[in-house]
């Protein structure tokens, strides 16, 4: 364990257009090399694509997608008596949001559409319909936790 103080959790400002801290966190996750204006443009254009494709409020579609991606359990490695065990643990609220945003962006970048806006929009739409790679990642994480349920007593 480090003897240094824990870094304080910085408060994120709400997004000016959607008035949501989650959107700001998503923009920060999309951002590469500190280019925030480009990340904002990608997200806002992706939301426009979602609006035209689904004829629904893009914020509602995004929130539904995020709820579908969010993991409830994950496995953490614990060393007990010289053996490493994959111990299933509940995910904290903050980590749930972080993981779901990270997975959404990661699997958007792996898609083969022409622009990042299209990739992100289609991944959000797929996630809201409970399909897509980010949903598969969540299911795989839950399967790992279920398979290692026998080691749940190592949780401390």
From Swiss-Prot:
Q: What is this protein called?
A: Small ribosomal subunit protein uS7
The alphabetized UniProt keywords are:
Ribonucleoprotein, Ribosomal protein, RNA-binding, rRNA-binding, tRNA-binding
A GO CC annotation recorded here is: small ribosomal subunit
Q: How does it assemble?
A: Part of the 30S ribosomal subunit. Contacts proteins S9 and S11.
Could you tell me which InterPro entries the record lists for this protein? Answer: Ribosomal_uS7 (IPR000235), Ribosomal_uS7_bac/org-type (IPR005717), Ribosomal_uS7_CS (IPR020606), Ribosomal_uS7_dom (IPR023798), Ribosomal_uS7_dom_sf (IPR036823)
Spell out the family assignment given in the record's similarity comment: Belongs to the universal ribosomal protein uS7 family.
Organism source for this protein? Mycoplasma mobile (strain ATCC 43663 / 163K / NCTC 11711)
A Gene Ontology annotation in the biological process aspect, one of them, is: translation
Q: Where is the signal peptide?
A: none
Q: Which SUPFAM superfamilies match?
A: Ribosomal protein S7 (SSF47973)
Q: Which gene encodes it?
A: rpsG
* Function noted in UniProt: One of the primary rRNA binding proteins, it binds directly to 16S rRNA where it nucleates assembly of the head domain of the 30S subunit. Is located at the subunit interface close to the decoding center, probably blocks exit of the E-site tRNA.
Which Pfam families is this protein grouped with? Ribosomal_S7
Q: Which GO molecular function entries does the Swiss-Prot or TrEMBL record give?
A: rRNA binding; structural constituent of ribosome; tRNA binding
Spell out the Gene3D superfamilies in the cross-references: Ribosomal protein S7 domain
């Amino acid at each position: 364990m480090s003897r240094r103080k824990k870094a304080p959790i910085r408060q994120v400002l709400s997004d000016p257009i959607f008035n949501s801290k989650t959107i700001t966190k998503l923009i920060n996750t999309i951002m590469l090399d500190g280019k925030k204006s480009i990340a904002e443009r990608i997200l806002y254009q992706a939301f426009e694509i979602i609006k035209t494709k689904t004829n629904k409020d893009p914020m509602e579609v995004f929130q539904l997608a995020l709820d579908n991606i969010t993991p409830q359990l994950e496995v953490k490695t614990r060393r007990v008596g010289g053996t490493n065990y994959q111990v299933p643990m509940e995910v904290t609220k903050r980590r749930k949001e972080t993981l779901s945003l990270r997975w959404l962006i990661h699997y958007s970048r792996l898609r083969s559409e022409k622009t990042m806006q299209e990739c992100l929009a289609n991944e959000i739409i797929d996630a809201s319909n409970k399909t897509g790679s980010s949903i598969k990642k969540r299911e795989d994480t839950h399967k790992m936790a279920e398979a290692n349920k026998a080691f749940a007593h190592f949780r401390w």
